[in-house]
Amino acid sequence: MEHQLIPFTVVLLAGGMGTRMKNLIPKQYLTIQEKPIALHSFEKLASMPEIEQMIVVCEPQYEQLFTVYKLNKPLIFARPGLRRQDSLWNGIKLIAGNPLVCIHDSARPFIEIDRIRQTVAEAEKWGAAVLGVRVKATIKICEEKQFIVNTPNRAFLWEMQTPQIVRLKLLYDGFSVAQKNELTVSDDVSLVELIDKPVKVVEGSYLNIKITTPEDLLIAQSILKNHALL
């Protein structure tokens, strides 16, 4: 059953330095199958007709990677900040009205369009939605010296992915609380949690990995070689 095409705006976060990759080139601009990782993500999103505009948060020297792609919708660039939330803030400041905002890590090139649309549909209903997968490993809470404190119930644990899709006004309201209290959040829907609004989790795919380490890069190359997985 096809989902109704709901319009939304994209903020593609492509400004991180990728220090865990131990490479001079930021991780999202390393290539897999002769194409920068960020461009895999960008092209997948750009193919969706319901997107009204795309905002790419990146350094100036990488803009040309995206401008060569012939879009039939507005493409706007914003600059990265020191933290993820600063980069997001710089991106959403360029958005007018109160659309749904689809925030995606450019280092996640294997996102599936159908799952994006499922998440958009839930965000349209609830105001905020995020892709996630059930945690498979046992997670331990440890103190500073790495001694175990307790073990949370795995049945309730989900690993968050992107896209994370939020109504623009909710993002502004969340930023207001974060900025007033000098809070740092680790993902985008945490801003919605700050204002006690619901966030719906949509079950995603374990293939929607974020390429962060050299090991991730090897896994990504393997995924691309086996197109049947996508």
Swiss-Prot record:
A Pfam family recorded for this sequence: IspD
Pathway assigned in UniProt: Isoprenoid biosynthesis; isopentenyl diphosphate biosynthesis via DXP pathway; isopentenyl diphosphate from 1-deoxy-D-xylulose 5-phosphate: step 2/6
UniProt superkingdom: Bacteria
Entry's EC annotation: 2.7.7.60
Broadest EC class assigned to this enzyme: transferase
Site (Positions MEP for the nucleophilic attack): 154, 210
Site note Transition state stabilizer, residues: 20, 27
Family: Belongs to the IspD/TarI cytidylyltransferase family. IspD subfamily.
Name of the molecule in the record: 2-C-methyl-D-erythritol 4-phosphate cytidylyltransferase
Gene: ispD
